[in-house]
């Protein structure tokens, strides 16, 4: 049986000067894995609001399989501006849906059938999503062909030493950007 490649964490809207664009590194990871022909899945949470419905529609249009829990928080957004050098600056909204991804028996079953998962520090800024991500990682098979990819994201104040160290201990692949 083919195992999943999963992006777990934020699914959101990047609000750019030219308009809204679907965003979230884990969701993008799952989408691109699917484009390469892998069985992929995005795991996140959205609000029961227009932006959440539009994320589902976009994922459907792109053929991205997903598990998006509907939670009583607004769908996440990020206000993106460019500095004088053209480098993106991010204002990431807090206490949004992807901060509250609930753990479930369905996620545990997905973890047991997961070949690779990409998770980040950003989605671990809240206790609910951090605990869900850690339980998912712990439920994954511990084999040489299973990959736990940690996408470290040191934006704004949304990280702490304890979460970074814990994630280093759970991952076997580290992704780092220089922006």
Residue ranges and their predicted role:
Residues 9, 44-46, 152:
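Short beta-strand/turn micro-motifs composed of small residues
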Residues 5, 14-87, 94-101, 105, ...:
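Substrate-binding N-lobe of the ribokinase-like
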Residues 2-6, 58-60, 66-68, 84-179:
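Ribokinase/PfkB-type carbohydrate-kinase core domain
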Residues 12-15, 119:
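A short, mixed-charge helix-start or loop-turn motif at secondary-structure junctions
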